[in-house]
Regions:
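Secretory/organelle targeting and membrane-embedding segments
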Residues: 1-299
């Protein structure tokens, strides 16, 4: 919110003409631990996509609210949820990947697969990973793919939003193929990274090299920022509702994910296996590659 609506720099670029795709990743290295019984009745879609990932999407895609009032903000977020491209049985098969982790190495240590976790049924079809493609069907975002991804036992603990900009319309420098990228870091660091192209100036030629402008908020403010849960508790005590979800937002989010759950209930194939310590099933990479893009860690 502060990045978008407190700074004039990005607003002229925050639209389909300048942005190629947006990626939202909520990755965990941990498994289900002792929560196997609870998690098996929930899964990654309900646990993370329906709420956390969609809330991040709405804040990235929303129109500027008329004020910093909670309802003004939530009205705009609701418009985004209503503009999300609805899923059909066919589009779920094409645009949604679900996975389940198997035994592997995570954080340098061997870990069991999901089916070997405590209180998890040995024949469970519960998903521990979801990657999906969607679009916001309005004038600002028409045609821009939004990729959402979450999972357990992945290669790193990483929560971030990656805004990939379009390349320049006419390239005059040789070999300059990487477009600009803005990375909004949420966990484990809290900061921003803007990736640009620049000339090294160390020799002949005009070859451009990727460089990053990296901002760590803790270092910039010379203090550790309040954590996400602490921030919510402080806002609740103060009666500030800007970050809290309104009931109509919640209902619309459930309407959007329900067709995915219904399609999975009729699909006998179950989730795709992926090794603990990886970035999920290969189909998740193929999902993005189909549009000519790649996940941030693959570029």
């Amino acid at each position: 919110m502060a990045l978008r609506f407190g700074n004039a720099l990005f607003e002229p670029l925050w639209r389909r003409e300048s942005i190629a795709n947006i990626q939202i990743t909520l990755a965990e290295q941990l498994g289900v631990g002792t929560r196997g019984a609870f998690y098996d009745g929930t899964g990654a879609l309900r646990d993370m996509i329906q709420n956390h990932a969609l809330q991040l999407l709405t804040m990235i895609a929303m129109e500027p609210p008329a004020s910093n009032d909670a309802d003004a903000i939530r009205d705009e977020k609701l418009k985004v949820l209503r503009a999300l491209k609805p899923f059909t049985r066919e589009s779920v098969a094409r645009d949604v990947v679900r996975g389940q982790y198997r035994a592997g190495m995570c954080g340098g240590h061997p870990v069991p697969g999901y089916l070997e976790e405590v209180k998890v049924p040995p024949d469970s079809a519960c998903e521990t990973f979801v990657a999906l493609r969607t679009e916001v069907q309005n004038w600002r975002w028409a045609g821009v793919p939004f990729y959402l991804r979450t999972g357990k036992r992945l290669a790193a603990r990483d929560a971030q939003i990656v805004v990939n900009f379009r390349p320049v319309p006419h390239q005059i420098f040789p070999g300059a193929s990487l477009p600009n990228r803005l990375v909004i870091k949420l966990q484990p660091e809290d900061g921003l990274e803007l990736q640009l192209l620049a000339h090294k100036g160390t020799g002949p030629g005009e070859q451009l090299t990727p460089v990053s402008l990296d901002l760590d908020f803790d270092k910039a403010f010379a203090t550790q920022r309040v954590g996400a849960y602490e921030r919510l508790l402080l806002d609740a005590i103060a009666g500030r509702l800007n970050l809290f979800v309104r009931s109509d937002e919640q209902e619309q989010a459930w309407r959007w994910v329900e067709p995915i759950l219904d399609a999975w209930a009729e699909d006998g194939n179950g989730p795709r296996a992926y090794a603990a310590g990886s970035w999920g099933p290969a189909a998740a990479s193929a999902l993005v590659a189909r549009d000519g893009f790649a996940w941030a860690e693959e570029q």
